[in-house]
Amino acid sequence: MAKDIYFNEDARKSLLSGIEKLSNAVKVTLGPKGRNVLIDKKFGSPTVTKDGVSVAREIELDNALENMGAQLLKEVAIKTNDLAGDGTTTATVLAYAIAREGLKNVSSGINPIGIKKGIEHAVTLASEKIRKSAKKITTKEEIAQVASISANNDTSIGEKIAEAMDRVGKDGVITVEESKTFDTTISYVEGMQFDRGYLSPYFSTNKENMSVSFDDAYILICEKKISTIKELLPVLEKVLNTNKPLLIIAEDIEGDALAALVLNSVRGALKVCAIKAPGFGDRRKAMLEDIAILTGGVFVSEELGLTLENVELEQLGQAKSVKVDKDNTTIINTGNKEQIKERAELIKKQIEETSSEYDKEKLQERLAKLVGGVAVINVGAVTELELKEKKHRVEDALSATRAAVEEGVVPGGGSTLIEVAMYLDTVDTSKLSYEEKQGFEIVKRSLEEPMRQIIANAGFESSIYIHQIKTDKKGLGFDAASFKWVNMIESGIIDPAKVTRSALQNAASIAGLLLTTECAITEVKEEKSNAGGGYPMDPGMGMM
């Protein structure tokens, strides 16, 4: 395949043109007065969104070189969204501003490597300032404010997320699902729930909904596969004497072991239910250990020198209640709170140490099941189009709220970035080279862009407002929703510090790559051949 090669200014100009096109499409969504973007779909209704990353994901340009620029900027939005859950439009606006100002300097002959170093130095100082300025959030009201802003100023979504987080805790699992009604509701699952149902419907205690319900139950947690009833007899006899129900969790239960358990259950001789252990491999072992700690029992494993034949009654786990259906098992725990807390701390440490996103996600699921239960936000809407858009907003708001709980919040509406720019004005840059000073200045100027865009989207000229913010006392900003000067924190116009910091860092990273690009290589576009395969029609020949 032949390639086109572009150098110097030719390459950079086209790349910047692609960045500008994507930025223009995304920036209209910024702020409380931001507009919607309509995205065509090959099948079904078009998508309506006010979410920056959703717009960015859809953009592919016809010109290969411009498209490379657009894809670079798209990376900023996606990376910021993955890391912080929000701030994608801010990151896009910042990246374009830094790239645009930087390329002006490169075009005038200033060394791009020095400019990049200056940008990195300014961003490091700015990020640290954002971290130090952050205010920790603790109340339900503050969480609702963050969630509402991230959900495009929808207070009902903010309140639902705050309610869910208040109930399950900051480490609890909150999932978002589509509701079958028009209303958005929250449902809760207490204790630990995992996706394993009973091995036989004959274990059911409620024949109407085919489910098992036990109160004050014993739980046998076993690593191995159980094939014969002989292995289980000692523990079954001990449980039978207590007249309490028993839940058996094992790798598998089959053959005459399962048949005997079903027979005893049907006859009413023993209240029992058997399920397969959740997870696979090492994760299964870890989850069984979690269940053991949650229920105050012992994990029966031959590796630990414990076999089924010598299990004592006090080594079994206990639960206030157990509910099992064909798909799920829920255990309401009675375990030692101190041991549960220690186990949770161990899992948190593993989350910090792992580099795999998949492992991190699974560890977070385990942590949530251990400490807080699960909240499900069921999103409802009148039309399917509205439902998809609303569900996406709820997911974004949830991610941003987690970021706010993690690192705190800063004044929103772009005012924090203005304050950071003013702080950079006070930094001594005398030891920086000329090129580095230019990079430093580029960041200072670019930090104003998000607020300029928010004000422009509200229909105002930004210069007057930017000047007033710089001269007013700290913490004041322009509320584009009500067109008033307000104290941003007191008015609940706040952004997660992690979102603001990630947006700036990711924007500067991609802009720096663009500035130091000297050559771009694209594939030569093949011209489409005449599909007819015949001779062209003589212009004089009309229709017969």
Swiss-Prot record:
Gene Ontology CC entries for this record: cytoplasm
Keyword Lyase among UniProt keywords: no
Residues binding ATP, per UniProt: 29-32, 50, 86-90, 413, 479-481, 495
GO BP field: protein refolding
Transmembrane segments: none
Pfam families in the cross-refs: Cpn60_TCP1 (PF00118)
Domain of life the protein comes from: Bacteria
EC number: 5.6.1.7
Subcellular location: Cytoplasm
SUPFAM superfamilies attached to this UniProt entry: GroEL apical domain-like (SSF52029), GroEL equatorial domain-like (SSF48592), GroEL-intermediate domain like (SSF54849)
Chain's role: Together with its co-chaperonin GroES, plays an essential role in assisting protein folding. The GroEL-GroES system forms a nano-cage that allows encapsulation of the non-native substrate proteins and provides a physical environment optimized to promote and accelerate protein folding.
NCBIfam families named among the record's database cross-references: GroEL, PRK00013.1, PRK12849.1, PRK12850.1, PRK12851.1
Name this protein carries in UniProt: Chaperonin GroEL
